[in-house]
Amino acid sequence: MKSFLRKPKFWLLLLGGLSTSSIILSACATPSNSALQAVFKPTSNQFFNGEHGTIQSALNTALRDPETNKKFVAAPLLKALEAWYENNQDKNITQFLKDTKTNVDNQYKTVVDKVVSAPRNKSLFVQQDLLDSSGGSEATWKARKLFEQLISDFASRVFQKNYLSYKENGKVSAGPFLYDTISKNSNWQNIVFDAVNFPETNDDFFAKIQSEVFDQWAEYTDPTIISSVTLKYSAPN
C-alpha cells in the first residue's frame, strides 16, 4: 500500500472521478441515504425493477449523477488519504491527521448537543436530523467530515508550490526566459515539472502529480494553445 501511495497515477485514478474507476472503487464504499435515493425513486424513470433490476444497472444509474458518483468514490479515497497522512515522513502531516480527527470528534459532539428534542427522544432526533443524511451512523458522519477536511488539505498541498520549470541539458531553471526560447515548438519538450530546487520531503511527489495532471489535461482537452505540442503524446487531432 505504501508503494502505491507514492505513485502519482494512483492518486489520479482516485481523484479523477472517472466512471470506470468509480465503478471499481464503489465496491468498497458505503453509500449514504441520499446516494441511494438518487437510484430508488418510485416516481422517477431512474427506478429499476423486473427484468431490468440488476445491481449493474443500479450502479450505472447512480454513477451518472455527479454528486452520487462522488459519494461512491469517497470511501476508498478516504482510506487512501488516511494511509498517506498516517505513514508520511513529514511529521507535520501525520500530526495534521491526528488534529483533524480530534476536531471531527469535537464537531460531532457540538452538533449533537444542538439537536433540539425532548431528552427521552434525543437519539431518535439525532438519527433523523443528523445521521440519516450522512450514511446513517456516527462513524459515517465522522468519515464524511474527515474526508472533506483531508481532501481539501491534500489538494492545497499538491498545488501550494509551482514546480513548472525548463530543463535543458540536465539543468533545471525556473526562469525568467527569453520569448524566443519558449515560443519555439522544438523547445516545448524541455518544459517539465521538477522539484530539484525544492528540498522538502513531499516536493518530488507533488511535482509528479502536477506533471500527471498537466499531461491528462493536454491529452483529453486538446487545448488550442498547445494543439501542436507532441511532448510524449502525438499531436491531438
Swiss-Prot record:
It holds the Pfam family DUF3713. A lipid is attached at C28 (N-palmitoyl cysteine). Residues 1-27 form the signal peptide. InterPro entries: DUF3713 (IPR022186). A lipid is attached at C28 (S-diacylglycerol cysteine). One of its GO terms (cellular component) is side of membrane. It is a lipid-anchor; GPI-anchor. It comes from the Bacteria. The keyword Zinc-finger does not apply. The keyword rRNA-binding does not apply. It is found in: Membrane. Keywords: Glycoprotein, GPI-anchor, Lipoprotein, Membrane, Palmitate, Signal. Belongs to the MG307/MG309/MG338 family. This is Uncharacterized lipoprotein MPN_439. It comes from Mycoplasma pneumoniae (strain ATCC 29342 / M129 / Subtype 1) (Mycoplasmoides pneumoniae).
